[in-house]
Swiss-Prot record:
Gene3D superfamilies with a match to the protein in the record: 3.30.70.1730
Gene Ontology molecular function terms on file: large ribosomal subunit rRNA binding; structural constituent of ribosome
Family, per entry: Belongs to the universal ribosomal protein uL10 family.
Cystine pairings recorded for this chain: none
Keyword Zinc-finger annotated: no
Xref: NCBIfam families: PRK00099.1-1
Matches recorded under InterPro entries: Ribosomal_uL10, Ribosomal_uL10-like_sf, Ribosomal_uL10_bac, Ribosomal_uL10_bac_type, Ribosomal_uL10_CS_bac
Quaternary structure and interacting proteins, as annotated: Part of the ribosomal stalk of the 50S ribosomal subunit. The N-terminus interacts with L11 and the large rRNA to form the base of the stalk. The C-terminus forms an elongated spine to which L12 dimers bind in a sequential fashion forming a multimeric L10(L12)X complex.
GO BP: any one term: translation
Name this protein carries in UniProt: Large ribosomal subunit protein uL10
Annotated Gene Ontology cellular component terms: large ribosomal subunit
Keyword annotations: Ribonucleoprotein, Ribosomal protein, RNA-binding, rRNA-binding
């Protein structure tokens, strides 16, 4: 572990994990170089990052930040960081797994907003949709309620204004 390359990789991993509240551990074995490259691109578009490193280095970096994933780091593993859109990154992983007959990448577990989660939680998160689509839905719901509220206020204003106009006439 003491070789210089491992030390550099560990330092890089530590830096990448700084401030990250959501990440996923995935099995990527069986993906072709082209599929892995496409997966990296899709994850990057969602504001995430896919890191392939030795399990020992990933485990050390995670343990130093108080997160133990030694049980999930068996076999070829990659760390997928989700800085901006955790649901979007989870969906990119899910879509990639559905896009091939092997179901790869296979999610082994994750850490979402400070809590360790299992595969089922990550799959549910992936089904939510991206942050942008959820924000769009929220804006739609809020604007509908605000429109109704404005309609009520206008009706009440007309009722009050109509009574005052009749008294003056």
């Amino acid at each position: 572990m003491a070789n210089e390359r491992n030390q550099q990789n560990l330092t890089s991993l530590r830096g990448s994990l700084t401030g990250v509240e959501t990440f996923y551990v995935v099995d990527y074995q069986g993906l072709t170089a082209g599929q892995l490259s496409q997966l990296r691109k899709n994850i990057r578009e969602k504001g995430g990052q896919l890191i392939v490193a030795k399990n020992t280095l990933i485990n050390l970096a995670l343990q130093e930040s108080g997160r133990d994933f030694s049980d999930a780091l068996k076999g070829p593993s990659a760390l997928v960081l989700a800085q901006e859109d955790p649901a979007g990154v989870a969906k990119a992983l899910s879509d990639a797994a559905k896009g091939n007959d092997k179901g790869i990448p296979a999610i082994k577990g994750g850490f979402v907003e400070g809590n360790r989660v299992d595969v089922r939680v990550v799959e549910r998160l992936a089904s939510l949709g991206s942050k942008q689509s959820l924000q769009g839905e929220l804006v739609g719901v809020l604007s509908a309620h605000l429109s109704n509220f404005v309609g009520i206020l206008e009706a009440y204003r007309d009722k009050l204004g109509g009574g005052a106009a009749e008294a003056q006439g």
